[in-house]
């Protein structure tokens, strides 16, 4: 199965040159996404106004929105969306960053939600970043047809009235 790298136009270059996502068949894998590029600090949208650090939304909200909008843009470029996510990993630098992230995540990720894991770790590679997210989604247009099991004559169907 061929794979295709997804690069968002205007995305900040990183020393590692990792694509925003990779599509392989019906699957799309978003790279770990933070509030700024590896080694480059936080994106202006996350930092906020330098003279008014407390103006507007809290940094955690801005950071989560930037991350999920970036993943959504990469998925859209690959023919899917966060709504088709099946696996979601979150890495946080402290418990205090979980609630702001989840507040924004609820706006992007609706039920049925993907399988999910949250990991706490002391720091991330983008200076000042407090959350990193990677996600796997399926392209519904390329998803395999559902498997229908012919169970009508299976003994368990009769025994348990399945």
Residue spans for each PLM region:
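N-terminal presequence-like segments and the immediate start of the first folded domain
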Residues: 1-69, 73-87, 92-162
């Amino acid at each position: 199965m061929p794979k295709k790298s997804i690069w968002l136009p205007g995305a900040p270059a990183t020393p590692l040159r990792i694509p925003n996502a990779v599509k392989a068949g019906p699957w799309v894998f978003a790279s770990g996404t933070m509030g700024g590029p590896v080694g480059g600090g936080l994106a202006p949208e996350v930092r906020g106004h330098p003279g008014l650090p407390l103006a507007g939304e809290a940094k955690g909200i801005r950071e989560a929105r930037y991350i999920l909008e970036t993943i959504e843009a990469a998925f859209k470029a690959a023919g899917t969306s966060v709504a088709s996510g099946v696996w979601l990993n979150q890495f946080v630098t402290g418990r205090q960053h979980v609630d702001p992230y989840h507040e924004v995540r609820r706006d992007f990720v609706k039920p049925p939600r993907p399988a999910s894991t949250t990991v706490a770790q002391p720091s991330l590679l983008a200076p000042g970043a407090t959350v990193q997210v990677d996600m796997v989604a399926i392209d519904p247009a390329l998803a395999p047809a559902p498997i229908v099991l012919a169970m009508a004559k299976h003994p368990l169907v009769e025994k348990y009235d399945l």
